Amino acid sequence: MSNRTPPEQLTDRLFATERNPEDFRFDASVARVFPDMIRRSVPGYTTIIPMIEVITEQYVQPGSHCYDLGCSLGASTLAMRHGIPYPDCTLVGVDNSEAMIERCEHYVALDDHDLPVTLRCEDILSTELSNASVTTLNFTLQFVPPEQRLALLTRIGDATLPGGVLVLSEKIRFESDAEQAIQTRLHHEFKRANGYSDLEISQKRAAIEKVLIPETLADHRDRLQRAGFDQVLVWYQCFNFVSMLAIKNS
């Protein structure tokens, strides 16, 4: 397949028939349907991606590095690319899934922009970070074991320049059981409205609940501040999905 040929995009039917339960993995089968899966599963995703371009344009610094950690197929990476006006910036996408990186390479090649993109098939917990003005963790931290999240965010905070930012998008949980029930029900209705059956919703939930560990907004705010960020604000929320902007002042 030529790098100028778009990868085949399929409708997500991975959980449409009964299957033995196993943990969710970002393998080749998921990579093939990922654009459809995330659009139909994550409310607000199609708003968050173009706003990452806007945020990048506001906070990117000349000669700095920009990172998309857990880049999957590169939607955030390309949004950042189009928000960077400086040709001396370095843009890096990192993902530990070979299937995702392989497909991401095609999307990067098809994108009409001159800024080079470096893709690394690496663990974000150990990938090299430095001189960062904009970093994104777009629905990625939730898949990192909770006991390793502070260390990762501290590494990002240490690598971030004064005036730099982290965009952190996450599925969250709520302190109140009543609110949790309402937000979960609304999220499931969103997925039904996008064509998922009750079987698909329940089977995906069973597959993902052991690997996607959501936390409260208070948990995220506290950890980001401990990691070296001075301001943390929620710039977007739809049901139990949020995107935060963490700013390092000094």
Curated annotation (Swiss-Prot):
S-adenosyl-L-methionine as UniProt keyword: yes
Top EC category: transferase
Signal peptide: none
Main function: Catalyzes the conversion of S-adenosyl-L-methionine (SAM) to carboxy-S-adenosyl-L-methionine (Cx-SAM).
Record InterPro entries: CmoA, Methyltransf_25, SAM-dependent_MTases_sf
Catalytic activity annotation: prephenate + S-adenosyl-L-methionine = carboxy-S-adenosyl-L-methionine + 3-phenylpyruvate + H2O
Gene Ontology terms: biological process: tRNA wobble uridine modification
Summary of subunit composition and partner proteins: Homodimer.
This protein's name: Carboxy-S-adenosyl-L-methionine synthase
Record has ATP-binding as a keyword: no
Matching Pfam families: Methyltransf_25
Assigned protein family: Belongs to the class I-like SAM-binding methyltransferase superfamily. Cx-SAM synthase family.
Keyword terms, alphabetized: S-adenosyl-L-methionine, Transferase
Annotated organism of origin: Marinobacter nauticus (strain ATCC 700491 / DSM 11845 / VT8)
GO molecular function: carboxyl- or carbamoyltransferase activity; S-adenosyl-L-methionine binding
EC number: 2.1.3.-
Top-rank lineage group of the source organism: Bacteria
Disulfide bond positions: none
Residues reported in the UniProt entry to bind S-adenosyl-L-methionine: 45, 70-72, 95-96, 123-124, 138, 205
